[in-house]
A protein has these predicted regions:
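Membrane-proximal, non-transmembrane interface segments of integral membrane proteins
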Residues: 2-87
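Soluble C-terminal extramembrane regulatory/interaction domains of multi-pass membrane proteins
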Residues: 76-186
Length: 186
């Protein structure tokens, strides 16, 4: 039980450090926003709904395609590379934590993120990305996106069960809701 509690705390730290930001970046660029629009409704979920969503997402391949043209592609990729590079040490420290062997799906997510980081780092001039190369990177992002959403729902269920006072902030800053606002309203 204590090992799983520590593992859940590591996952929570991941979302605080980088996971929520990745979801926000990927979701804002996703051509298929409708495929995740139901994730705006999380304030109304109970444990049964979390379990239902986790079961649905376990092996799901969520519709995803970066819908950015021309010069904005390079800007998106440069910003993504900067984010990943700034969190590289954190990600490597996470993946070196032996407790993560207990959570194979999360380890797979970290490996996918580090792979994308490496792909972007090996491209010194992201302004020169061809459509074919961009499509390859889009595939890497899609792989991360599906895993990231599953782990995010798992994380929310954990917070809802063990730390319900913490989930309020997540709901107010929901990365799937472009109108989300951290401020508490009447």
């Amino acid at each position: 039980e204590a090992i799983y509690e520590k593992l859940d705390m590591l996952i929570s730290t991941f979302f605080t450090e980088i996971g929520n930001e990745l979801i926000k970046e990927f979701s804002s660029a996703n051509e298929f926003k409708a495929s995740t629009s139901y994730l705006k409704a999380i304030p109304n979920w109970d444990d049964a709904e979390y379990d239902k969503q986790l079961k649905k997402l376990k092996n799901a391949n969520i519709d995803f395609n970066v819908d950015i043209e021309g010069g904005k592609r390079a800007e998106f990729l440069i910003n993504l590379r900067t984010l990943l590079k700034s969190k590289r040490e954190f990600l490597i420290n996470l993946i070196n934590n032996p407790q993560l062997f207990e959570k194979e799906e999360f380890s797979g997510l970290l490996i996918s993120i580090l792979h994308l980081d490496e792909e972007l780092e090996h491209r010194p001039d992201l302004n020169q990305i061809t459509d074919t190369d961009f499509n390859h990177l889009n595939g890497d992002i899609k792989r991360i996106y599906s895993k990231l959403i599953y782990e995010w729902i798992y994380y929310l269920k954990y917070l809802n069960t063990h730390y319900p006072y913490m989930i309020s902030l997540i709901i107010r800053t929901n990365p799937f809701d472009e109108d989300a606002d951290v401020h508490i309203k009447d």
